[in-house]
């Protein structure tokens, strides 16, 4: 992954800075976004590439997932391409340097680049060493460290790569986590990132909890554990093993979840739609379907460093 990041960083010197059309500015989460299209969590896990990613055209960059405790993630290999499906399988396991280190890095970045940064979201998750029953305090620690420097907080309870994490999506388990994060948020916007594999009624329940707690939004969706409908040979998929699937195969379910959320949230909370977005037409369709902002990641891997630039041009 570091090699991929480095390749994209070097590409920045060869292209001009791209800014989305002024007509596409978006007012959301108490901020003015230079466009609706941002980079999803998972690429810049340690907040090392925020400014270069803005230079590539992303209006917002969601760093992480960050955990309170530094951790190496799962053993390699842990990231696999399925080119025939324009998809990735990852079981990274929240590898990151820990909330305190990453918060210090963002603080320094804000001091040295006060006007040249995108909107910065901090995606926070449970430390692997922490038991599920202690998750609220673990999320609290991450929120306390990152809230002073992030523009919004994204509570990730939907990665399939941390044991027990997805059990935290139930309303009963999620409520104390969100209460803890809210107490440490310094008033920064809080969004919940959900899995596409949740049953429809559970998605609606989470949306209602967001409204009840007067939180700021939902990010829909994370990766899926489903392998349905892939054209990649079964033996190749099985060789990749367990992990979250992202990319084009996620498109339809992610869009369906957006259609579920819109009538529940009714514009009272922001929806960031992510999953299977590759083109400006797809991004525009998500906006038309009720998303306030859209994100991508796997398309960045398959379509290269000019990907955001092309989408921004077409969204003008």
Where are these regions (language model features)?
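C-terminal helical cap(s) of enzyme catalytic domains, especially alpha/beta-barrels
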Residues: 70-86, 228-243, 299-316
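A gly/proline- and charged-residue-enriched helix-loop-helix capping module
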Residues: 64-116
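Glycine/Thr-rich beta-alpha phosphate-binding loop at enzyme active sites
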Residues: 5-22, 157-173, 209-267, 306-307
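An N-cap/entry alpha-helix motif that binds or orients negatively charged groups
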Residues: 1-26, 87-95, 99-100
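Short beta-strand/loop segments at the ligand-binding rim of alpha/beta enzyme cores
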Residues: 30-38, 115-122, 184-198, 263-273
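Catalytic cores of alpha/beta
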Residues: 46-55, 198-213, 262-267, 277-294
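Active-site glycine- and acidic-residue-rich loops that bind
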Residues: 127-139, 167, 192-212
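Glycine-rich phosphate-binding active-site loops on the catalytic face of alpha/beta enzymes
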Residues: 57-71, 217-227, 276-277, 282-310
